């Protein structure tokens, strides 16, 4: 019999930046170099019913607390019925209350939103998938009532006047954005994948594992998060963002899409058995074939990665569809271009790895090959932009990247991932003077280019996020004081 869960479980998962391999990672023939970031999405799960709480233990551990929590039922729910309340306190009215429903014919578990307001599809789908898996593995019919708090490090969203003032008033790592979630502008760091990963992982750890099981259970959590994330976003995407959220920085080759094609919709007959087989990698016809190499890879000493928010996000799924349509209609031309891009990306990765393996602190002159490979990648990407008629590196971004590349200490930069008008990523010399120069540049920068897709760059802001190597991890509860 599985142990009763503790009162509180806390985990976080990182955002990502796909330095190379945008669009290519959609095809298993190609790879992408993805870096985890130090900006993370945090999920804190609290068990609210006495009969689901472990007896108080001495001391506390990473990610867990046995401190007694609220007693009784949540919001007057019936004794035999669990309630889940999800709260994102950094945003206005960001509360979702769900009842838990068990489906017939092995359909698993579905949550149904009780309160008014817009749905949160990523939260809802994550709950459906995680609770279905947990109930099947644990053979449990009673989850009790749960309170789930979601917190995002500040760089996931563009700064607002309210959040700026909030940050000045508080020493907390989290700020109050002062807007509704649907009004907040994302900076393109992979918040949905980090959210899904942290949410399903925290629930599975909370109900079926110990925090120390996080490492050995990472592959199963990866499979569950991929299934939930694909379902929530309409099965568009390669999964590199979830892989980075689970494993951290790595060289990524996507899984075969057929692995998830059989899972079906949550609640459909037999869903819980199909999901179990996918998570446990128990389908001999469709084994998981994701490749994640160079786990925890780091940048060379003397190099740093920074991101800049251009306050004009892209609609990734529609851009992906258009690029894939172009490739289908121009297969030979596209394959030649993608082959050249893959070859250059691999040279860049190997050069970064070679430099990172050296114990020496590198100077700017050591990074000339990196600068050359970045420029070549951009040349190929601009060619794909023109041929596909999709703004992967639109003219206003070219103007910005070219100007930044001329600054002393800047090695080079790209529009990462799917491209467009999202955050840009720069590789720079790890020197405070370079950061000072970048901030001064953005104070006076004004785009003068006439964009080929009608896009506009407003204010450009240097984000505080830096590269990191860790994936999903347990967290200490003290940092959430005042928020949970």
Swiss-Prot record:
One example of a Gene Ontology biological process annotation: ergosterol biosynthetic process
Q: Which GO cellular component term is one of those annotated?
A: peroxisome
Q: List the disulfide bonds.
A: none
The yes or no answer to whether the keyword Thylakoid is present is no
**Chain residue ranges for the region called Disordered:** 54-77
Q: What highest taxon heads this organism's lineage?
A: Eukaryota
The UniProt record lists the EC number as 2.7.4.2
Known pathway: Isoprenoid biosynthesis; isopentenyl diphosphate biosynthesis via mevalonate pathway; isopentenyl diphosphate from (R)-mevalonate: step 2/3
| InterPro entries attached to this UniProt entry | Erg8, GHMP_kinase_C_dom, GHMP_kinase_C_sf, GHMP_kinase_N_dom, Phosphomevalonate_kinase, Ribosomal_Su5_D2-typ_SF, Ribsml_uS5_D2-typ_fold_subgr
- Function (record text): Phosphomevalonate kinase; part of the second module of ergosterol biosynthesis pathway that includes the middle steps of the pathway. Erg8 converts 5-phosphomevalonate to 5-diphosphomevalonate. The second module is carried out in the vacuole and involves the formation of farnesyl diphosphate, which is also an important intermediate in the biosynthesis of ubiquinone, dolichol, heme and prenylated proteins. Activity by the mevalonate kinase erg12 (AFUA_4G07780) first converts mevalonate into 5-phosphomevalonate.
> What family is this protein classified in?
Belongs to the GHMP kinase family. Mevalonate kinase subfamily.
This protein's name: Phosphomevalonate kinase erg8
Q: Whose protein is this, by species?
A: Aspergillus fumigatus (strain ATCC MYA-4609 / CBS 101355 / FGSC A1100 / Af293) (Neosartorya fumigata)
């Amino acid at each position: 019999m599985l142990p009763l869960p503790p009162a509180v479980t806390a985990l976080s998962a990182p955002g990502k930046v796909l330095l190379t391999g945008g669009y290519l990672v959609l095809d298993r023939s190609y790879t992408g170099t993805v870096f985890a970031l130090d900006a993370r999405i945090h999920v804190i799960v609290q068990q609210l019913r006495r009969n689901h709480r472990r007896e108080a233990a001495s001391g506390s551990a990473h990610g867990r607390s046995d401190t007694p929590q609220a007693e009784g039922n949540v919001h007057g729910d019936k004794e035999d019925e669990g309630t889940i309340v999800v709260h994102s306190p950094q945003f206005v009215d960001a509360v979702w209350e769900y009842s838990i429903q068990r489906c017939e014919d092995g359909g698993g578990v579905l949550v149904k939103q009780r309160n008014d307001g817009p749905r949160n599809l990523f939260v809802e789908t994550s709950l459906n998938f995680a609770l279905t898996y947990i109930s099947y593995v644990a053979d449990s019919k009673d989850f009790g009532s749960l309170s789930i708090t979601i917190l995002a490090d500040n760089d996931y969203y563009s700064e607002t006047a309210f959040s700026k003032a909030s940050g000045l008033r508080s020493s907390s790592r989290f700020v109050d954005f002062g807007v509704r979630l649907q009004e907040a502008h994302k900076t393109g760091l992979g918040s949905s994948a980090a959210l899904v990963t942290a949410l399903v992982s925290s629930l599975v750890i909370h109900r079926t594992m110990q925090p120390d099981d996080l490492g050995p259970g990472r592959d199963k959590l990866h499979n569950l998060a991929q299934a939930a994330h694909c379902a929530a976003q309409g099965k568009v995407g390669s999964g590199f963002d979830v892989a980075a959220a689970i494993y951290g920085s790595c060289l990524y080759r996507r899984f075969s899409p057929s692995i998830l094609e059989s899972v079906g919709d949550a609640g459909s007959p037999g869903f819980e058995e199909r999901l179990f087989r996918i998570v446990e990698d128990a389908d001999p016809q469709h084994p998981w074939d994701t490749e994640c190499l160079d786990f925890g890879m780091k940048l060379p000493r003397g190099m740093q990665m920074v991101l800049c928010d251009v306050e004009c996000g892209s609609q990734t799924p529609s851009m992906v569809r258009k690029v894939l349509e172009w490739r289908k209609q121009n297969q030979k031309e596209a394959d030649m271009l993608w082959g050249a891009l893959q070859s250059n990306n691999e040279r860049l990765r190997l050069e970064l790895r070679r430099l990172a393996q050296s114990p020496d602190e590198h100077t700017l002159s050591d990074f000339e090959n990196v600068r050359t490979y970045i420029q070549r990648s951009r040349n190929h990407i601009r060619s794909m932009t023109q041929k596909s008629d999709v703004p992967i590196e639109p003219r206003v971004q070219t103007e910005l990247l070219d100007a930044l590349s001329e600054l002393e200490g800047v090695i080079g930069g790209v529009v990462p991932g799917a491209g467009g008008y999202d955050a840009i990523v720069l590789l720079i010399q790890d020197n405070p003077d370079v950061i000072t120069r970048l901030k001064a540049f953005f104070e006076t920068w004004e785009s003068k280019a006439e964009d080929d897709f009608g896009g506009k760059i407003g204010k450009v802001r240097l984000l505080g996020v830096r590269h990191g190597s860790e994936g999903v991890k347990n967290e200490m509860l003290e940092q959430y004081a005042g928020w949970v």
